[in-house]
From Swiss-Prot:
Binds 1 zinc ion per subunit. Monomer. It comes from Gloeobacter violaceus (strain ATCC 29082 / PCC 7421). The gene is mutM. It catalyses: Hydrolysis of DNA containing ring-opened 7-methylguanine residues, releasing 2,6-diamino-4-hydroxy-5-(N-methyl)formamidopyrimidine; 2'-deoxyribonucleotide-(2'-deoxyribose 5'-phosphate)-2'-deoxyribonucleotide-DNA = a 3'-end 2'-deoxyribonucleotide-(2,3-dehydro-2,3-deoxyribose 5'-phosphate)-DNA + a 5'-end 5'-phospho-2'-deoxyribonucleoside-DNA + H(+). The keyword Amino-acid biosynthesis does not apply. Pfam families: Fapy_DNA_glyco (PF01149), H2TH (PF06831), zf-FPG_IleRS (PF06827). This is Formamidopyrimidine-DNA glycosylase. The active site is at P2, E3, K61, R268. The lineage of its organism: Bacteria, Bacillati, Cyanobacteriota, Cyanophyceae, Gloeobacterales.
Length: 284
């Protein structure tokens, strides 16, 4: 699933291409790719003539692309979605679900192999949270001032949940997924199975700094491509090639040469270095 760095990369790409583009036609090839309005015909009708503004926001893994008249196109890529900026004459990708042609001859295409992603058209004056319910359940942005060691201490107090599982909770912090959770735990030297309630203030401060650091690195590398993710031009991200632990089972740790191990925590594949991330306390 695309995480914060991948969605932020996409936002920055679209900010280059979309402002001033006028929608001249919409084709919905898969009706369940449109979350709102429920009737794709209404979605198509209300998209006609919309002009994209330069107001393009990211909240966690969600995108909000605003139009000049105040409506917005909401996007969540989920597992395998892609937003692609294409010349209108370019062949359709195999899993294209929605086409949004522009007056310039270009198209914004929503491609989604697994069909979990969604587009929403948010009417003028309607809070996005009323249409995109997931926005109401998001915690702070990782780059927000309130996201720090003491914030983590308050949220983790008395809890026995593995720290890896806690980091994936979007109500704790918005935008962190499997890749960058593993990377942050390696960077902070914390074993992924340790109970969050047992982490001291120093460990939580390291973890806070590590989350910010690996997300910034992911953005700088234009995201991580493991299966489906590409940027708006269809180009793969570069982070996976420089990852510390994620996707590197059996390969030597880049710090100590110990083979990277993979376990499952709460049903999620989890990578770590058993030397750099020792289980320093018992895990029940």
């Amino acid at each position: 699933m695309p995480e914060l760095p991948e969605v932020e990369t996409l936002r920055r790409d679209l900010l280059i291409h979309l402002p001033g583009e006028r929608v001249v036609g919409v084709e919905v090839l898969r009706s369940d790719s449109v979350g709102y309005p429920a009737d794709p015909a209404i979605f198509i009708e209300q998209m006609q003539g919309q002009i994209f503004s330069d107001r393009m926001l990211r909240r966690g893994k969600y995108l909000l692309l605003y139009f000049a008249r105040g409506a917005a196109l909401g996007v969540h890529l989920r597992m395998s979605g892609r937003l692609l900026w294409r010349c209108g004459e370019a062949p359709l990708e195999p899993h294209t679900r929605v086409r949004i042609p522009m007056a310039s001859g270009h198209e914004l295409r929503f491609e989604d192999m697994r069909v979990f992603g969604r587009l929403w058209l948010i009417p003028v004056g309607v809070p996005p949270e009323r249409v995109m319910g997931g926005l109401t359940r998001l915690g702070p942005e990782p780059f927000a001032e309130m996201f720090d060691g003491p914030y983590l201490a308050g949220r983790f107090a008395g809890r026995n949940q593995p720290v890896k599982s806690a980091l994936l909770d979007q109500q704790l912090v918005a935008g962190v997924g499997n890749i960058y959770a593993d990377e942050a735990l390696f960077s902070s030297g914390i074993h992924p199975a340790l109970p969050v309630g047992g982490l001291d203030a120093a460990a939580l401060e390291r973890l806070h700094r590590a989350v910010v650091k690996v997300l910034e690195a992911g953005i700088a590398q234009r995201g991580a491509t493991l299966r489906n993710y590409t940027d708006a031009q269809g180009i793969n991200g570069n982070y996976a090639g420089t990852a510390w632990v994620y996707g590197r089972k059996g390969q030597p740790c880049r710090v100590c040469n110990t083979p990277i191990e993979r376990i499952r925590l709460a049903g999620r594949s989890t990578h770590f270095c058993p030397t750099c991330q020792r289980a320093q306390q018992s895990v029940q």
